[in-house]
Amino acid sequence: MKLANATWMNDVQIQAQALASAQIEADAVVVFGTKAEFENASGFPGAGACAAAVRSGLFEAECCKAYVVATGEEKAPVLIAVGRKEEALTEKQLRLSLAEAARVAVKHRLSRVAVIVPEQLVEADAAAAQSFAHMMVEGFLLGAYQRVTYKKDAKPAHTFASLNLYAAELATEAWNEGIKTGQAYALGTTYARDLTNLPGNVLVPSTLAEQALELAEQFGLEAHVLDEKQIEEKGMGGLLGVGKGSVNPPRMIVLKYQGTDEWTDVYGIVGKGITFDTGGISLKRAANMDEMICDMGGAAAMLGTMSVIGRLRPQKNVICVIASAENMPAGNALKPGDVITSYSGRTIEVLNTDAEGRLVLADGMTYAKELGASKLIDAATLTGAVGVALGSITTGVVTNDDAFYDTFKAAASRTNELVWQLPSNQEYWDMLKSDVADLRNAIPGGAGTITAGLFVGTFADELPWIHLDIAGTAFLASSRGVDPKGGTGVMVRTIAETILS
């Protein structure tokens, strides 16, 4: 299974160095400046060429845009000039600037990159310096992402040997800690992107389980996987029902990280892992059905989060549950009108087999509770309705606990991942009632994102719970900001930040 960034991003050497004592050895040097600063540039390799380029109008030093400047000097590094405004760089601008610089370096296949840290960041206190180092490394690695292709003559992905941050003054411990966390967050996100981008004939529930087991082995996590027989024996009717129409049987995947002596205060993170979604008997339209390779984006987000946790090894407890199936039409597939029994014992009237994500999540949520979760976050490409409401820019949120959401929202603010809370009034909960079962899985009319989320939340029972509908944000038609076309790995950084903070 080809995962584009699994190797080189682990191997790239990243460090911070004091500028005064350093001999810069690089294929590319990244510098920041306003137009006026570049016009009078000095003190870095290629400064004269940079000044001449700006004066002649070759580039305008637009904020967060990266420009290649030919120095004209033999064996000299390529200069990548990144524009900025007069005001101090924000964390969002810093991430994006480094992502743009990385994309330029990938395009020109430059392997050793040096970044001259702006004075504003050098003068920061230790806490701010750690944050800035985090943003720079994270932004660079997110921008360096390259999707695997399956072309006969495809070039191998460009790899980076080193990324060095050069600062006039250096709070070494703070910078090193920021580098460590920034790299971990980026690696978790790019891992999730890789999984999301895999074709549906490559990634099926069993191979997703294999990926999870490999991740567990890499980071020393506890893991177990339930196969279809065990799923049936346990009475996980939601997951079993969705998966029974496919020749690729379902899997319930569990990863456990215990960072404290006692198994208490446990974050339960639950991901929807539909490796391909045809809609089942309630068949989707053919247009854009190929994008349903991303219907396991919630599972990818949670595995990416466990990658971050495994690297940073915080004093936290986390149980990750992935409910994985392939939703296919067949003679034995789930049908509209069927009534199934979930792992919780609640019965569900299936009105639409294309509302399958909430069925598998129902069992995943109950299993996470059984395994000790004391608070729950689920992520799923759950509804098309969230894209109508929020587009591909913002992740929709439904919750039963405003205090828990406030913590999560603060984390999202720090990671610059946009989220928006939707209402959860009792009237919406009432819409889930069925005449023939405890719940129905589809509701006619509007409020589809809200009611789908609340369906999942039913299985949280009394626990604090946050639902993330990433159907609009998990897979993009074109690149935007630090996110590439295709799988984005959305919410990895925010979920990890919530747990770590």
Task: Describe each PLM feature range.
Residues 1-266, 270-273:
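Short amphipathic alpha-helical segment within the helicase RecA-like ATPase core
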Residues 1-8, 15, 87, 209-501:
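A generic structural signal for tightly packed, nonpolar segments enriched in small/aliphatic residues
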